[in-house]
Amino acid sequence: MFLLHEYDIFWAFLIISSVIPILVFLISGVLAPINEGPEKLSSYESGIEPMGNAWLQFRIRYYMFALVFVVFDVETVFLYPWAMSFDVLGVSVFIEALIFVLIPIVGSVYAWRKGALEWS
């Protein structure tokens, strides 16, 4: 028979972890001073008056390299637990991990062939 009281601790943690951030945002909104002025609209540069415009455009190439880095970084995070328990898992999990690694590699080769990773 399925008993709901087995999940009481889970629900308590879920409720507490949801209520605390909401309370923090509400309290900070109530206690924060509301001062609008030109100082709030300027960028802060270690106490020095800002020089030039704070809005800069970056080339799309930076975003492409950052995106490729994030994809492989997330892949590494997912593969680490698999590698730590490799001796316990079977061959089918190895094949699944191989497919998991091949999908971003195929995507990177495609982006490389299309010239998305060229720096020129």
From Swiss-Prot:
It is a multi-pass membrane protein. Its EC number is 7.1.1.-. Its main location: plastid. It catalyses: a plastoquinone + NADH + (n+1) H(+)(in) = a plastoquinol + NAD(+) + n H(+)(out); a plastoquinone + NADPH + (n+1) H(+)(in) = a plastoquinol + NADP(+) + n H(+)(out). It is an enzyme of class 7 (translocase). The chain crosses the membrane at residues 9-29, 64-84, 88-108. InterPro entries: NAD(P)H_OxRDtase_bac/plastid, NADH_UbQ/plastoQ_OxRdtase_su3, NDAH_ubi_oxred_su3_sf. GO terms for molecular function: NADH dehydrogenase (ubiquinone) activity; quinone binding. Keywords: Chloroplast, Membrane, NAD, NADP, Plastid, Plastoquinone, Quinone, Thylakoid, Translocase, Transmembrane, Transmembrane helix, Transport. It is found in: Plastid, Chloroplast thylakoid membrane. One of its GO terms (cellular component) is NADH dehydrogenase complex. NDH is composed of at least 16 different subunits, 5 of which are encoded in the nucleus. HAMAP family: NDH1_NuoA. Belongs to the complex I subunit 3 family. NDH shuttles electrons from NAD(P)H:plastoquinone, via FMN and iron-sulfur (Fe-S) centers, to quinones in the photosynthetic chain and possibly in a chloroplast respiratory chain. The immediate electron acceptor for the enzyme in this species is believed to be plastoquinone. Couples the redox reaction to proton translocation, and thus conserves the redox energy in a proton gradient. This is NAD(P)H-quinone oxidoreductase subunit 3, chloroplastic. It comes from Chloranthus spicatus (Chulantree). The gene is ndhC.
